[in-house]
């Protein structure tokens, strides 16, 4: 099916002011203590290695257990759908909106990341999905509370666009237990290594948006 250009509608909608239609969004919410505890137990129990599917230079990346994705979706599913809906509105400058009654977010796959000293994730993006995410379960003190607030050790950085004036092409977040980020699957991101003891424990999930099953 050929999609008609949005140009005429955008032109008519934009009456004046300042327009920022190009930047991809990043969503953030806070996970419940109960879900964090559940995921930490699942991380310890998982014996399947998911690392062979990933770009990370990280030894321990266990796969989700059978029901883990469903449990997480009970808490984050609506937020993921809201994030997708906000993207539709932003990309179309308010012309189009998602019909939340007929659509749902689904987990494509998920895995844990048990990062240790000197391990890292190179710049990469995700495939076979529409959105990706990361949630933090345990963070070493030297990452959470660094002596130098500009220290990037253990941080995640997202990168997009061509470096030039008046444009932000990179944004960095310091991991905090309970923080959960959602972003477009094609958005490049990297995780920096850190020094010292401790484990930087996190999980990642990929999502897609689809029409609801009539029986759901």
Question: Residue locations for each model-derived region?
Answer:
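Non-heme Fe(II)/2-oxoglutarate
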Residues: 2-100, 111, 118-121
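Catalytic core of non-heme Fe(II) oxygenases with the double-stranded beta-helix
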Residues: 105-182, 190-192, 199, 209, ...
């Amino acid at each position: 099916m050929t999609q008609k250009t949005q140009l005429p509608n955008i032109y008519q909608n934009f009456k004046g002011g300042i327009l920022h239609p190009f930047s991809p969004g990043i969503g953030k919410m806070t996970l419940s203590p109960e879900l964090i505890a559940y995921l930490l137990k699942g991380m310890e129990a998982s014996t399947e290695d998911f690392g062979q599917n990933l770009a990370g230079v990280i030894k321990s990346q266990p796969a989700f257990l059978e029901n883990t994705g469903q449990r997480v979706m009970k808490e984050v599913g609506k937020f993921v759908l809201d994030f997708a809906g906000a993207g539709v509105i932003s990309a179309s400058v308010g012309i189009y909106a998602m019909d939340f009654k007929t659509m749902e977010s689904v987990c494509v796959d998920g895995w844990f990341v048990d990062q240790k000293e000197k391990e890292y994730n190179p710049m990469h993006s995700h495939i076979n999905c529409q959105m990706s995410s990361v949630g933090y379960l345990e963070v070493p003190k030297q990452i959470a509370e660094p002596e130098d607030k500009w220290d990037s050790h253990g941080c995640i950085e997202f990168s997009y666009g061509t470096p030039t004036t008046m444009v932000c092409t990179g944004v960095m977040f310091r991991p905090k237990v309970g923080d959960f980020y959602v972003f477009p699957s094609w958005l490049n991101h990297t995780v920096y290594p850190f020094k010292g003891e401790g484990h930087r424990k996190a999980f990642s999930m990929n999502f897609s948006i689809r029409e609801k099953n009539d029986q759901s």
